[in-house]
Amino acid sequence: MATKTLKVTQTKSSIGRLPKHRATLTGLGLRRINHTVEVEDTPSVRGMINKVYYMVSVEEV
């Protein structure tokens, strides 16, 4: 069975944000505004997305 993936796009800047939130964006593989990555839909990734929900947009692929 194929694993689900999520398309995560950074929509806001990380400048002036908490260091943990910046590190979370890096952990997701995001580098700049409008950068999009595809990640596996796992509980740990969902937790990271929930932590920085105000800076990213998510689509199911």
Swiss-Prot record:
Gene designation: rpmD
One GO CC term on file: cytosolic large ribosomal subunit
Domain of life the protein comes from: Bacteria
SUPFAM superfamilies, alphabetized: Ribosomal protein L30p/L7e (SSF55129)
UniProt entry keywords in alphabetical sequence: Ribonucleoprotein, Ribosomal protein
Cited HAMAP family: Ribosomal_uL30_B (MF_01371_B)
InterPro entries named among the record's database cross-references: Ribo_uL30_ferredoxin-like_sf (IPR036919), Ribosomal_uL30_bac-type (IPR005996), Ribosomal_uL30_CS (IPR018038), Ribosomal_uL30_ferredoxin-like (IPR016082)
Name this polypeptide is given: Large ribosomal subunit protein uL30
Keyword Ribosomal protein: yes
